[in-house]
Amino acid sequence: MARYLGPKAKLARREGTDLFLKSARRAIGDKSKFETKPGQHGRTSGSRTSDFGLQLREKQKVKRMYGVLERQFRRYFAEAERRKGNTGANLLLLLESRLDNVVYRMGFGSTRAEARQLVSHKGITVNGEVVNIASYLVKTGDVVAVREKAKKQLRVTESLKLAESMGLPAWVQVDATKLEGVFKKSPDRDEFGSDINESLIVELYSR
């Protein structure tokens, strides 16, 4: 399955929530009408969505939010099952540990897609080494930095300013002068993704 390249607002409306696919500088506002499904006037249905439908919808929402394809997502779920603790929480923590997501959380990209592009174009280092794999899992204590060639990009500095004004997550520490940050710890489940119901995804893969 290829990555979706169409209108981001359409995806948000399909899932009924903001997927944070667009920069806060161009945030999806009221016009997106998340509660209205794609189509000129939205699709209507007199039938209640099945449990399977709800589970599938939640999985699709999380995949699109983090920009992960089905095969990758299944691998993350398998790893989450192998780890101790709650499988659903483990799954989300794995997704949060992806390098592209950490770059986004640190404010070096205004969206996960922009952060992913920065990584793939070799604009990011981890502990001083260039890493261009978006799915690379960042560990506690790792230092993630913007390379010199990428520091000149106005979008990087603008994104960081915006992120700082909105408040950076507690699990990262960012030096705005050096354009680098430390992944202080894995976030607690209650620190992010309050609109995600990971138990539905666990139920889906347990069928």
UniProtKB/Swiss-Prot annotation:
Q: Which GO terms describe its molecular function?
A: rRNA binding; structural constituent of ribosome
CDD domains assigned: S4
Q: Which residues form the S4 RNA-binding domain?
A: 97-158
Keywords carried by this UniProt record: Ribonucleoprotein, Ribosomal protein, RNA-binding, rRNA-binding
Return the Polar residues bias intervals: 42-52
> InterPro entries, alphabetically?
Ribosomal_uS4 (IPR022801), Ribosomal_uS4_bac-type (IPR005709), Ribosomal_uS4_CS (IPR018079), Ribosomal_uS4_N (IPR001912), S4_RNA-bd (IPR002942), S4_RNA-bd_sf (IPR036986)
Per UniProt, subunit arrangement is: Part of the 30S ribosomal subunit. Contacts protein S5. The interaction surface between S4 and S5 is involved in control of translational fidelity.
Q: What is this protein called?
A: Small ribosomal subunit protein uS4
Q: Which gene encodes it?
A: rpsD
